[in-house]
Amino acid sequence: MAELACFCYPHLENDSYKFIPFNNLAIKCMLTAKVDKKDQDKFYNSIIYGIAPPPQFKKRYNTSDNSRGMNYETVMFNKVAVLICEALNSLKVTQSDVANVLSRVVSVRHLENLALRKENHQDVLFHSKELLLKSVLIAIGQSKEIETTATAEGGEIVFQNAAFTMWKLTYLDHELMPILDQNFIEYKITLNEDKPISDVCVKELVAELRWQYNRFAVITHGKGHYRVVKYSSVANHADRVFATYKNITKNGNAIDFNLLDQRIIWQNWYAFTSSMKQGNTLDVCKKLLFQKIKQEKNPFKGLSTDRKMDEVSHVGI
């Protein structure tokens, strides 16, 4: 994750702002600079290479002292920065909005995936600039639309029916901020269209998940799509979701946290997010992840979770 101010800076033109991507030499200069505490939140002028990000964001970049940041000297960093600028420049951002826009925290990996989709000549985003910009605006929180299959970050499609598409995420192969844990495996499920879904399509998805992905929990971060994650990583996801939710609501911003379809979501996660929305503490909410919750009556007749050991999926082993 990183703030948009880590990728670009605003330049006032008439009554609105144009956004310009940083170059990596300017960032490198900022990372070596000694800056007064009172100037930590200001864009840094490298003199030679142009404007650089505010020094307060130093930890967002990979250095010899910090291996967890972005690999800003890669070609991919420039591709993502340009993509963000193209999307922001399609809007009219005024002085009253610019600080809020640049402080927004976005998923670096999501944006790299969109950059990869843009370069794939078989992908619809390669052929449609309008759809590409729409996808980026959704990714950076400048659109209220949800991420559907056409505007999704992408990955490897492992399941699809008339209503849903399931993607295996490819973060291990990334340049900008790769996942270093070689055991990482995670999926995302997007809606093909943001409209009511038939019970038949839901049943098909639930059957696929219970049969092929029974070692995973189906959760949501509240943004209109599902995530399919290892049970061992659920607590980590819970911490992140709770922190994000509290941070947004603390600042007085309304958040439409979408609980999604209870028939698909892991029931303990549904209980966790419902409790979170009611205003309970993290400890109270997280206890629900580890409690045995009484199984709801199976909404799909004939669909069982009972499997013999030789029938259990080996995905995720």
Swiss-Prot record:
Record Gene3D superfamilies: Rotavirus NSP2 fragment, C-terminal domain, Rotavirus NSP2 fragment, N-terminal domain
GO biological process terms held by the UniProt record: viral genome replication
Highest taxon in the source lineage: Viruses
Binding site for ATP: 107-109, 188, 221-223, 227
Catalytic residues as annotated in Swiss-Prot or TrEMBL: 225 (for ntpase and rtpase activities)
Molecular function terms from GO: ATP binding; metal ion binding; nucleoside diphosphate kinase activity; ribonucleoside triphosphate phosphatase activity; RNA binding
Cofactor or coenzyme needed: Mg(2+)
EC number: 3.6.4.-
The keyword Nucleotide-binding is annotated on this UniProt entry: yes
Pfam families: Rota_NS35_C (PF02509), Rota_NS35_N (PF21067)
Primary localization class, coarse: host cell
Spans annotated as RNA-binding: 205-241
SUPFAM superfamilies on file: Rotavirus NSP2 fragment, C-terminal domain, Rotavirus NSP2 fragment, N-terminal domain
Sequence intervals crossing the membrane: none
Protein localization: Host cytoplasm
Entry keyword set: ATP-binding, Host cytoplasm, Hydrolase, Magnesium, Metal-binding, Nucleotide-binding, RNA-binding
InterPro entries xrefs: Rota_NS35_C, Rota_NS35_N, Rotavirus_NSP2, Rotavirus_NSP2_C, Rotavirus_NSP2_N
One GO cellular component term noted in the UniProt record for this chain: host cell cytoplasm
Functional note: Participates in replication and packaging of the viral genome. Plays a crucial role, together with NSP5, in the formation of virus factories (viroplasms), which are large inclusions in the host cytoplasm where replication intermediates are assembled and viral RNA replication takes place. Displays ssRNA binding, NTPase, RNA triphosphatase (RTPase) and ATP-independent helix-unwinding activities. The unwinding activity may prepare and organize plus-strand RNAs for packaging and replication by removing interfering secondary structures.
Subunit description: Homooctamer. Interacts with VP1; this interaction is weak. Interacts with NSP5; this interaction leads to up-regulation of NSP5 phosphorylation and formation of viral factories. Interacts with host DCP1A, DCP1B, DDX6, EDC4 and EIF2S1/eIF2-alpha; these interactions are probably part of the sequestration of some host SGs and PBs proteins in viral factories.
Family membership: Belongs to the rotavirus NSP2 family.
Listed name of the protein: Non-structural protein 2
Organism: Rotavirus A (isolate RVA/Human/United States/WI61/1983/G9P1A[8])
Source lineage: Viruses, Riboviria, Orthornavirae, Duplornaviricota, Resentoviricetes
